[in-house]
Each structure stands twice: as C-alpha cells, then as structure tokens.
C-alpha cells in the first residue's frame, strides 16, 4: 500500500508556467485525504517553491536542494541535511570561474548569487530564459566565497550556469572525477553540485527512515536526471515521457 508519494516539480507536477493544474491539485488533495503523504522533491529550496505547492493543505515534508535538506514544514526545521563544507564550495566556485559561469549558492534554504553578475543574466544563453525569475528570487552578495565563510555553516548546493554551451560536457567530465561532490542537472543547461552521495534518493531514504516507511510503500514520479536516484529507490516509479536521466551523455543538455 502506498503511504508516501515523492513528486518532482518542474516538468512533472507543475505546468510550464510554474503552476499546478486543477486536475493535479485535486488528485494530490484526494491522496492526502486518504492518508498518503505527498512530498515535493526538488532541486529548489523550500522558499523558492511556488506558492501553489508550499501552501497546498497537507504538505508536511519536502525534499529540497536535491536531497541536501529534508524539511519538516510544520516544525520549520530540517530533519536531515547533507551539506558541503566551505573548502568544497570554494573549490567549486573557483572551478566555475574558470569557465566564466554564473554561480549560485543554496544555503539555509535560500539562494544567493554575486551582485556583480545579477545584471548580466541575459549573457548566459540558458539562464536568460529565467532572467526575471532569477532577479526576483536570488539574494545578491558581494562575494559568494566570503559570504559562505562568514556564514560558518555547510552549503546545500552550488548551481553553475556555463556561459558557453560547449563548456558543459567538458565541465561535466571533470566534475565526475571529483570524489568530494555529486553532480546532476535538471535539464536546463545547468550543473547542480551537491555533497558526495547527496541526491533526491538519499533524501527520500532518510525521510522514510525518519517516518518508518518501507520503500515498498513509496511511489516517486519525475522527468529528469536529478530524479533518477529517487525513482530507483521507490517501490513504484512513474517516469514522465520526457525523462532524461537515462541519457548516456550530458552533451545534449
């Protein structure tokens, strides 16, 4: 019997304009009315999820930042974290600078970027499609490295947007050799960097252990590379028609 449904957001639960259809909303409400836990599982922080998800009655837990934070909505705290130390974050930011990337840092449930680059979003081909969203949701700081160092805590995720499309496979190959991190992509031309072993599947595993729910009683649905680990973990999985996680190479991103 299904006790928990883990749902990717972009491309799965949400429509292209970042909202949930009435049909999907009603289906989730019906599942929750029957006692099933509905858990958003996303590369975003909880704060950056659209309000139609955050404010959905009955949402108790969320897997955020690709599993780096498992958030208890009602208690307003993380019940599990898998974070990167400053040294790893600084290394990833230096790496991104080598390829003139637009970097983002996810820390304590918020997304940060460099103030000096915020007005240059349109220069990044893949990022330019989300320029208005980025400018309205990212918190700008003078120096990401200094900000992380001063924060004195681990980082959930580093998100790199390459300026040149041809740099993506080169960067991907180099990062695959780094044993300190796990990498994935949500299909938008970005490279999402987490602590080694951190992914949506790991976050879902720890949530299930916390709730004492067997994986056989879990359903997961997703459509992209970063959904693969949780689809493999769940007893029942629903892969959307545009699923990319089985792609042999990131060259088409």
Label each region the model flagged:
Residues 3-16:
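Asp-based phosphoryl-transfer active-site loop
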Residues 22-126:
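Active-site phosphate-binding/coordination module
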Residues 31, 66, 204, 230-231:
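Hydrophobic residues within well-ordered alpha-helices
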Residues 35-39, 59-60, 157, 216-217, ...:
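Short active-site oxyanion
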Residues 37, 102, 182, 236-237:
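Residue-level detector of anion-binding/catalytic polar loops
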Residues 43, 219-224, 239-240:
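Glycine-rich beta-to-alpha transition loops that act as phosphate-gripper elements at the mouths
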Residues 95, 106-221, 225-227:
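Conserved acidic, metal-coordinating active-site core of Asp-based
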Residues 245-250:
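Conserved small/polar residues in nucleotide/adenosyl-binding loops
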């Amino acid at each position: 019997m299904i006790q928990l449904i883990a749902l990717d957001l972009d491309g799965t639960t949400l429509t292209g304009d970042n909202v949930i259809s009435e049909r999907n909303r009603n289906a989730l409400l019906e599942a929750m009315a029957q006692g099933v836990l509905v858990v958003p599982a996303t590369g975003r922080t909880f704060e950056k999820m659209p309000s139609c998800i955050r404010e959905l009655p009955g949402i108790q837990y969320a897997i955020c930042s690709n599993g780096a934070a498992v958030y208890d909505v009602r208690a307003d705290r993380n019940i599990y974290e898998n974070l990167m130390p400053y040294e790893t974050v600084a290394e990833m930011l230096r790496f991104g600078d080598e390829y003139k990337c637009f970097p983002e840092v996810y820390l304590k449930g918020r997304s940060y970027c460099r103030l000096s680059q915020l007005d240059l979003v349109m220069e990044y081909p893949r990022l330019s499609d989300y320029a208005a969203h980025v400018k309205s949701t990212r918190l700008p700081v003078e120096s990401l490295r200094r900000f992380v160092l001063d924060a004195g805590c681990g980082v959930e995720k580093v998100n790199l947007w390459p300026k040149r499309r041809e740099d993506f496979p080169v960067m991907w190959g180099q990062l695959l050799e780094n044993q300190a991190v796990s990498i994935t992509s949500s299909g938008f031309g970005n490279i999402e960097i987490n602590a080694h072993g951190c992914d949506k599947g790991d976050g879902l595993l720890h949530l299930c252990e916390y709730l004492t729910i067997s994986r056989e009683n879990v359903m997961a649905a997703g459509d992209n590379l970063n959904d693969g680990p949780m689809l493999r973990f769940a007893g029942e999985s629903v892969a959307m028609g545009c699923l990319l996680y089985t792609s042999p190479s990131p060259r088409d991103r």
